[in-house]
Amino acid sequence: MGNLFCCVQVDQSTVAIREQFGKFDAVLEPGCHCLPWFAGKRIAGHLTLRLQQLDVRCETKTKDNVFVNVVASIQYRALAGKANDAFYKLSNTRSQIQAYVFDVIRASVPKLNLDDAFEQKNDIAKAVEDELEKAMSAYGFEIVQTLIVDIEPDEHVKRAMNEINAAARLRVAANEKAEAEKIVQIKRAEGEAEAKYLSGLGIARQRQAIVDGLRDSVLGFSVNVPGTTAKDVMDMVLITQYFDTMKEIGASSKASSVFIPHGPGAVRDIATQIRDGLLQGQATTTSH
């Protein structure tokens, strides 16, 4: 109907390429245009100005010999001012862009190790975008943005990488646990040392109090009971201590079987041994 009345409609965000007798004549903007077909004019085709996206999957190898699939996303559009170049100079725009993407990725990724490739995704995308912009601008296309969407290693490589990361995390956790246990043991040892120190002070003070009490008892008994000697008082004190010890052993619920002599003669022998030991110690101190 439009051709019958020599009129043609061009939709929004689209341009039409008009030819006259097979030769490029003009680029028609959106709207209604007169197209006298009897003068040899016709519409050769339409070209969209909308933003388009092309996803490219490229297989390549990294510097450390790991095969990866690099997924790039290219956003591009035709320039209205160069619509004739975009329409006539390229027969398959998407294939041309894909070829440039393959070329840049396969030139960039093999220079990088796998870990570096993940870290430098933006650098790879920038290299692809620069190359595409330089090449496609001559054909009337603008490269809006280039993204490296993903880098996919082989499934076995991904599994190995996950195992390496898991092992590293377990190693860190084990080191932290060992360090915590070390701190606990150090603190426990410090606490035990402090407890033993305080216990030693308590025992020393207890023994000093016992010695002071015995000394006072011996002196008091000697004064109040005429005719007694210090030896008699010491024998009495030792007997008292002996029976107190037996009483405590018998009263303890956790006591083991203890066999000790219990007759008066045995007490006398113990007293003699203690007294002789004290005299020998005193003699040794005096000789030195």
Swiss-Prot record:
Coiled coil (UniProt feature): none
Gene3D superfamilies: Band 7 domain (3.30.479.30)
Name of this chain's protein: Hypersensitive-induced response protein-like protein 1
Leader sequence residues: none
Job of this protein: Positive regulator of hypersensitive response (HR)-like cell death. May be involved in potassium ion channel regulation.
Disulfide bridge positions per record: none
Chain residues carrying a lipid of type N-myristoyl glycine: G2
Keywords, sorted A to Z: Lipoprotein, Myristate
PANTHER family: STOMATIN-LIKE PROTEIN 2, MITOCHONDRIAL
Keyword Lipoprotein annotated: yes
Species for this entry: Oryza sativa subsp. japonica (Rice)
UniProt-listed Pfam families: Band_7
